[in-house]
Structures are given as structure tokens and as C-alpha cells.
From Swiss-Prot:
<feature type="active site" description="Nucleophile; for glutamine hydrolysis">
    <location>
        <position position="380"/>
    </location>
</feature>
<feature type="binding site">
    <location>
        <position position="139"/>
    </location>
    <ligand>
        <name>Mg(2+)</name>
    </ligand>
</feature>
<dbReference type="GO" id="GO:0044210">
    <property type="term" value="P:'de novo' CTP biosynthetic process"/>
</dbReference>
<keyword id="KW-0436">Ligase</keyword>
<dbReference type="Pfam" id="PF06418">
    <property type="entry name" value="CTP_synth_N"/>
</dbReference>
<feature type="binding site">
    <location>
        <position position="71"/>
    </location>
    <ligand>
        <name>ATP</name>
    </ligand>
</feature>
<feature type="binding site">
    <location>
        <position position="13"/>
    </location>
    <ligand>
        <name>CTP</name>
    </ligand>
</feature>
<dbReference type="GO" id="GO:0042802">
    <property type="term" value="F:identical protein binding"/>
</dbReference>
<dbReference type="GO" id="GO:0003883">
    <property type="term" value="F:CTP synthase activity"/>
</dbReference>
<feature type="region of interest" description="Amidoligase domain">
    <location>
        <begin position="1"/>
        <end position="265"/>
    </location>
</feature>
<feature type="active site">
    <location>
        <position position="514"/>
    </location>
</feature>
<keyword id="KW-0665">Pyrimidine biosynthesis</keyword>
<feature type="binding site">
    <location>
        <position position="222"/>
    </location>
    <ligand>
        <name>UTP</name>
    </ligand>
</feature>
<dbReference type="InterPro" id="IPR017926">
    <property type="entry name" value="GATASE"/>
</dbReference>
<dbReference type="InterPro" id="IPR027417">
    <property type="entry name" value="P-loop_NTPase"/>
</dbReference>
<feature type="binding site">
    <location>
        <begin position="146"/>
        <end position="148"/>
    </location>
    <ligand>
        <name>CTP</name>
    </ligand>
</feature>
<keyword id="KW-0067">ATP-binding</keyword>
């Protein structure tokens, strides 16, 4: 049976519980253990698929089509363990299941209540489908004291009791603010956070204290005394220079050792952290720098592009260079000269998005890259905008539009109404529910012989993750190819365009999928590695 680690947070949100969970998973892996990571989100949405990126940040997509919290991206990048539908649960999903069962009569006339029915569903989620692993790490979203989080805290309290001593560890991430005017660190927020946690029946075993400066020994003793934990279990969590330094920093503070001690494991293998040390060294000592202009809609909250940012960093790691990102609001491009802000970049990337806002700015960015021979990477919506640009300015389809934002003109981009998943055909129509109705998850594609993407991937058949409900109309394929836009990747049935490229260009590729979701620091996605290599070449030409 696996052992369970429950990660909670207090004082404020955004303390890095997701990163802490991912780093702990990586440290346990470095000792030879198998891990699984899960996220429990207390919000009432069934999933984050219909939430604004400004509200929630990125919506992460798994191979099996789950629209999930961005923390699952951290989990995958740090551990390499693919996440699934079974690794993210929300209050909305739990209540939906319970109400469905109640309507069927499954509760045999009982009064359906938060305890035991909601808490039992949460416990079932935590314990089910764990697989053959040594540790399951469960992160509870939000902070202790949140009303919506109470059923989750009660469920893990019960699990701690039911699993028994030595099978469950509670780790609480908290804040130790440093008051500059007073010149001292304050422990009261942490004490009150732990007091709140203990009031609902959970005694933390370990405190991961986020702070700006080292914790004085006296404060460590004080925290341990008032929070009822060992002094060695008060772990310092200072900001790291790089995301990928976090496992090394936490190991240096003894976090993984303390976790194993709490489980009664004193004969664990020593960790092999050589891979993490190598990544840290590469990031700290880059051999050059490239600037990538990212023309997006949600640049006001960079968490909306979390996986993209990391995938570009992985491309930099693959080439031994630092990747500097220049964020450009696509809507601003519609008001000002779109070319001027891009003059100093070595590559242009247009990421995914939805809706009409900023469309013409993205199209202008694609035109700049095509005409100036600057490396261009269009992802999902970005590929569609590159196709519209080519249709308008190369193929003469001057009124080319997407039905996503216009009903007039030639629909070069249209609603995706039918596609194949395995041996089944999925269909959608106008008016269907918005949530969970896109083309989601991993789908195969076939690459054209002799194409740039075929060379980049080094194989003819690939599988990538999708999240879209609009698609390039394959009926325009011949007309666009005659003008130089090659359809170099198609679905196996040849119906859905997956990749386009321009042969007479140093590097111009658009993909309908999201390659950033499968990039890892130790295995940079080949498209991002190649894109940064092209940008590096461009930087040495100017």
C-alpha cells in the first residue's frame, strides 16, 4: 500500500504548494521511489475549462483529455509521471457525482450530507487508482480556513486516522514575513495558521516556511514549540534563483529526509541529484541569450502561459542559452505599428487563445515574421492566425476569417464538428454545452516526408495534446500549398490539418496542438529546442 503525503497551505495563497509538491515528488524519485501526485481543488466549477485565464491561470490538459489545474503541469515537468483525469478533483465534480447518485436512488432514502457523503467521495478519490507507487502526494488547493475547503480538510483528517501511523504525513506550507521597518521576522501568522489547522483536527508533521531571509535559530525553536512540531521539521523555504533549483534547495534544508523520518524510514537510498545539478548549472551559466516576442491576449497574468514559459526555458536549456521573453499585447498591435515592437526579437511566438479580441494583432505578428524571415512559432490559435494571414496575403482570399469571430467572409477556419478518437467518432454542434466539449487530449498525426517537422521530430508518427473547437478547413489545403504554405502534418485520416510550415523560410511552423504540455526540463520538446536554435541563429545574423 502506498504512503500518503498531504500538502496544505496557510496565511495566504500563491506560496508555492504546487511547486513544493512537485519538488518533493522529484526528491523521492531521486531516491528510487515511485510517486503519484494529485490536486484537490475546492471550487464549484467541474473543471477549469470554462474559467478565464485571468481568474485561474493556465488550463492544463492531460493525455486522456482532462482540463486540469496548472499545478499538474508542475507535477509532470518535475517527475515525468503523466497525469490523468484521476489526478485532479473539484468540489463541482464531487457534487455532480453525488447529486447524480442521489437522483438514481443509490443512497436508499438517506439524507445526503457533507459528512459522510461528500467526505467519502473525497477519500475515494484520494485512495483510488493510485497504481503501483510508493508515495501519493495530495495537494489541497486554497488555504486553511477557507469555507469551501472544509470538507477536504475533514476528509484528509479522517484519512490520517484510517491509514494509521507511519502511512500518512501532513505538510503545511506557510509564510514567515520579514518586516523591514522592524527588522525582524514575524512568526505569528504561521502560529495562527497552524492553530486553525489543529482546530479542525489536523496536526502538521512538517512546516515548510516560505521566507525571504534565513530563519534565525531562535525563531525555529519558537515555531517548533508553539506549533507542536520538531525543530528539525521547521523547514526553510526561500525563493530560488530558478524554478529547477527548488528540489536542490529543499534537499539542502533536509525536507526529504524529514519526510522519510516522519514515515519511520531510516534506511532510504541516498538521492541521486546529478540531473538536477546539471540543469541548475546550465541555467546559471548560459552561453548566450535570445529574445522571443510572445504576442498574446492574456499577458496581464503570465500564469496563463505557465507551460509555454517553461517549454521555452527548456528550449534554452537544450541550446545552452538564456531565453528572454518580450511580452506583447496582441490587442495593442491593432492600434499601433505592429512591426516596431518586434524589430529587436530573434523569434516570434503566437500562443493559443479564444475569441475575437486581439485577432488582427496576432495576424500582423505572423505577417511580420513571414516577411522579415524571423523564426515564427504559432500554437493552436496562433497557427490558425498564421493560416488566415497566408490566405489573405498569399492566396488572395482577402476576406478569410474564422467562424469563431465572424459570420461574414470565407470561413478558412471553422467549427470542428466531427473527429475520430481511437475507433470512435466524436461529434459536436453549435449550441452544445461549453464545458468539456472541445477536442481534448492526445491525438495522433502523420508528418509529411521531407518536411521540416519530420526532420525535427525524427519520426513520421507523433501524438500531441489538443484543446480546441475550431480547425483549419482542409478544403483550402491545395490553394494554400500552391502559395507556399505546406500542410506538413495531418490527422491519420487526412481530414484535420495539424501542422503547417513555410518551406522558403528559416523557421515558420504552426501547430494545432499544444507541444508545451509535453516538454520537460530533461526532455525538451523537439519543436521548442529547434525553435530556440533557429532564434539563436537569427541572433547571430543581426
Amino acid at each position: 500500500m502506498p504512503r500518503y503525503i498531504f500538502i496544505t497551505g496557510g496565511v495566504v495563497s500563491s506560496l508555492g504548494k504546487g511547486l513544493a509538491s512537485a519538488a518533493i515528488g522529484a526528491l523521492l524519485q531521486a531516491r528510487g521511489y515511485k510517486v503519484r501526485l494529485r490536486k484537490l481543488d475546492p471550487y464549484l466549477n467541474v473543471d477549469p475549462g470554462t474559467m478565464s485565464p485571468y481568474q485561474h491561470g493556465e488550463c492544463y490538459v492531460t493525455d486522456d483529455g482532462a482540463e486540469a489545474d496548472l499545478d499538474l503541469g508542475h507535477y509532470e515537468r518535475f517527475t515525468g509521471v503523466p497525469a490523468s483525469q484521476a489526478d485532479n478533483i473539484t468540489t463541482g465534480r464531487i457534487y455532480s457525482r453525488i447529486i447524480e447518485r442521489e437522483r438514481r436512488g443509490d443512497y436508499l432514502g438517506a439524507t445526503v450530507q457533507v459528512i459522510p457523503h461528500v467526505t467519502d467521495q473525497i477519500k475515494q478519490f484520494v485512495l483510488s487508482d493510485a497504481g503501483d507507487v510508493d508515495f501519493v502526494l495530495c495537494e489541497i488547493g486554497g488555504t486553511v480556513g477557507d469555507i469551501e475547503g472544509l470538507p477536504f480538510f475533514e476528509a484528509i483528517r479522517q484519512l490520517g486516522q484510517e491509514l494509521g501511523e507511519g502511512n500518512a504525513v501532513f505538510l503545511h506550507v506557510t509564510l514567515l514575513p520579514f518586516i523591514k521597518v522592524a527588522g525582524e521576522m514575524k512568526t505569528k501568522p504561521t502560529q495562527h495558521s497552524v492553530k486553525e489547522l489543529r482546530s479542525i483536527g489536523i496536526q502538521p508533521d512538517i512546516l515548510l516556511c516560505r521566507c525571504e531571509i534565513p530563519i534565525p535559530p531562535g525563531d525555529k525553536r519558537k515555531i517548533g514549540l508553539f506549533c507542536n512540531v520538531k525543530e528539525s521539521a521547521v523547514i526553510e523555504g526561500r525563493d530560488a534563483a530558478s524554478l529547477y533549483d527548488v528540489p536542490l534547495e529543499y534537499h539542502s534544508q533536509g525536507l526529504d529526509t524529514e519526510i522519510l523520518r516522519c514515515f519511520g524510514i531510516d534506511d532510504a537510498p541516498a538521492p541521486d541529484l546529478s540531473r538536477w545539478q546539471g540543469i541548475s548549472e546550465t541555467i546559471a551559466n548560459p552561453d548566450g541569450e535570445v529574445t522571443i516576442g510572445v504576442v498574446g491576449k492574456y499577458v496581464g497574468l503570465l500564469d496563463a502561459y505557465k507551460s509555454l514559459i517553461e517549454a521555452l526555458a527548456h528550449g534554452g536549456i537544450a541550446n545552452g542559452v538564456k531565453v528572454k521573453l518580450k511580452w506583447l499585447d496582441s490587442e495593442q498591435f491593432e492600434k499601433d505599428d505592429p512591426f516596431e515592437p518586434l524589430e529587436d526579437v530573434h523569434g516570434v511566438l503566437v500562443p493559443g487563445g479564444f475569441g475575437e479580441r486581439g485577432v488582427e494583432g496576432k495576424i500582423a505578428a505572423a505577417r511580420f515574421a513571414r516577411e522579415r524571415k524571423v523564426p515564427f512559432f504559432g500554437i493552436c490559435y496562433g497557427m490558425q492566425m498564421a493560416v488566415l494571414e497566408a490566405a489573405r496575403n498569399l492566396a488572395g482570399v482577402t476576406d478569410a476569417v474564422s467562424t469563431e469571430f465572424s459570420d461574414t467572409g470565407e470561413s478558412v477556419i471553422g467549427l470542428l464538428t466531427e473527429w475520430t478518437r481511437g475507433n470512435e467518432v466524436e461529434t459536436r454542434k453549435v449550441g452544445d454545452d461549453m464545458g468539456g466539449t472541445m477536442r481534448l487530449g492526445a491525438y495522433p498525426a502523420v508528418l509529411k516526408d521531407g518536411s521540416k517537422v519530420r526532420e525535427i521530430y525524427g519520426q513520421a508518427h507523433i501524438e500531441e495534446r489538443h484543446r480546441h473547437r475550431y480547425e483549419v478547413n482542409v478544403g483550402y489545403k491545395d490553394r494554400l500549398e500552391a502559395c507556399g504554405l505546406t500542410f506538413s502534418g495531418l490527422s491519420p485520416d487526412g481530414v484535420l490539418p495539424e501542422i503547417v510550415e513555410i518551406e522558403d523560410h528559416p523557421w515558420f511552423i504552426g501547430v494545432q496542438f499544444h507541444p508545451e504540455l509535453k516538454s520537460r526540463p530533461f526532455e525538451p520538446h523537439p519543436l521548442f529546442a529547434s525553435f530556440i536554435a533557429a532564434a539563436l541563429h537569427q541572433s547571430r545574423m543581426v
